[in-house]
Design a protein with these regions (language model features):
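Metal-dependent phosphohydrolase cores
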Residues: 1-185
Length: 185
């Protein structure tokens, strides 16, 4: 492993080999329903990328979807939504840290940050569709109001093992035209 300074991250310290961490990084802080094995960030990113492709989005938008949570492999990790959306000083600091990690990842791999509106809008929409699908398939039933939820995908999500998530992510990397970052790693 390399070294990472979360309060002064540098794109040149982002290593391709580190990206596998997203295949082990659980979404929702591991708070999925009983019987659901860990659902990882990389699986989610693959599904976002595939949804963007199904909608006919350009390769750059698909690539941004594939990388949209890769900054989470660094501190502070995958934070639950209420933690990042709050007005508490910790929430504000965690969101700033998360944005800075994502900026470094995107800059290192030649992707824009922040995403321009024509990329941000479809990536956020795909992310929201996946959130609805993940809630239906992976979360325990609850009376908690999550606000306006979009229609989930018809397909059900079955969590993948880390190696399967990694292989699928690498396949998507090639499909979006970014295989060169593997060859340069």
């Amino acid at each position: 492993g390399g070294i990472w300074y979360p309060f002064s991250p540098r794109p040149e310290e982002v290593r391709f080999a580190d990206q596998f961490a997203a295949a082990r990084l659980p979404r929702y802080g591991c708070h999925t329903k009983r019987g659901v094995d860990r659902y990882v960030v990389m699986h989610h990113e693959v599904l976002v990328c595939r949804l963007l492709r199904a909608w006919g989005e350009p390769l750059i938008t698909q690539a941004c979807g594939l990388f949209h949570d890769q900054g989470e492999i660094y501190t502070p990790g995958d934070q639950i939504g209420p933690m990042l959306r709050g007005s508490h000083p910790f929430s504000i600091a965690a969101k700033a840290l998360a944005d800075e990690q994502q900026r470094c990842v995107n800059q290192r791999f030649g992707l824009p940050w922040p995403y321009p509106e024509h990329i941000a809008k479809p990536v956020k929409l795909a992310d929201a569709v996946l959130l609805s699908t993940e809630r239906r398939d992976l979360m325990a039933d609850s009376d908690v109001d999550w606000g306006h939820m979009l229609e989930p995908l018809p397909e059900r999500i079955e969590p993948w093992e880390p190696e399967r998530a990694w292989e699928a992510w690498l396949n998507e990397l090639e499909l979006v035209g970014m295989w060169h970052i593997v060859e340069c790693a």
